Curated annotation (Swiss-Prot):
Organism in which the protein naturally occurs: Staphylococcus epidermidis (strain ATCC 12228 / FDA PCI 1200)
Any single biological process term in GO: heme biosynthetic process
Positions of Fe-coproporphyrin III binding: 12, 29, 45-46, 53, 124
Gene: cpfC
Protein name per Swiss-Prot or TrEMBL: Coproporphyrin III ferrochelatase
InterPro entries registered for this protein in UniProt: Ferrochelatase, Ferrochelatase_AS, Ferrochelatase_C, Ferrochelatase_N
Amino acid sequence: MTKTIGLLVMAYGTPYKESDIEPYYTDIRRGKKPTEEELQDLKDRYEFIGGLSPLAGTTDRQAEALLEALNKEQDDVNFKLYIGLKHISPYIEEAVEQMHNDGIKEAVTVVLAPHYSSFSVGSYDQRAQEKADEYGIQLTHIKHYYQQPKFIKYWTEKINETLEQIPNQEHDETVLVVSAHSLPKGLIERNNDPYPHELHETAEILKQESNIIHVAEGWQSEGNTGTPWLGPDVQDLTRDLYKEHQFKHFIYTPVGFVCEHLEVLYDNDYECKVVCDDIGVNYYRPEMPNTHPLFIGAIVDEIQSHI
């Protein structure tokens, strides 16, 4: 008899329409409403990338692709999909409640973020767990999947494809900037959080597996909290790398993200490119994983190792 297990795919969430922007931003700021200036700044960023972020649709497609791939691999288990978002409906708690209403007793949770931090993935897991405990649902949490061979293979292929656009004799004048979303430094240090190490390990593996010669690690998209965040910021890093090594070609791989959204389309494709244009170097940013079979396969492999 086939057993039904819940598959709770969790993600950050993004506004679906312009009127969602203020409540969404307020939720991110833990109930503190943004000023008119802050709200307009966010609206301007969305406008710059062509309206609202494509994240919502991509999250749905990634979750559906993951469900399909998992169910193809299983004969005795049937996964049922639930999507839970951090900052907009359907919230994580709503997804767990729906599981309960559907009679789900057991579920696997996965966050659409490849590296673990107690501040990010850990907070998603905690919210899901607290709600699941109310209903007696047993959850298996997938912590990370950056180390999965298919995840590494995806990025290795993209790096090598990008290098092919650069003359061979200029590969030594090319640098790969590997980045993830910055987080508050104090919080990371207090918790002895593995997040910076996991990004470093990713960068090291990509250097070993790809044809790139020079690799640098950076952080991006930090919040405006008035406290130190993990650095160096990718824009500062770009200027420093150029100043120290005179690299001609900069390849940006924001491996902490899994699709094209505001942080990639604006913070990389606009802000980093502005810096590259300013110092007179070439900007490259390979396509993000989105629903690529290697990326989906990496998550499938990680889930299968836990069930």
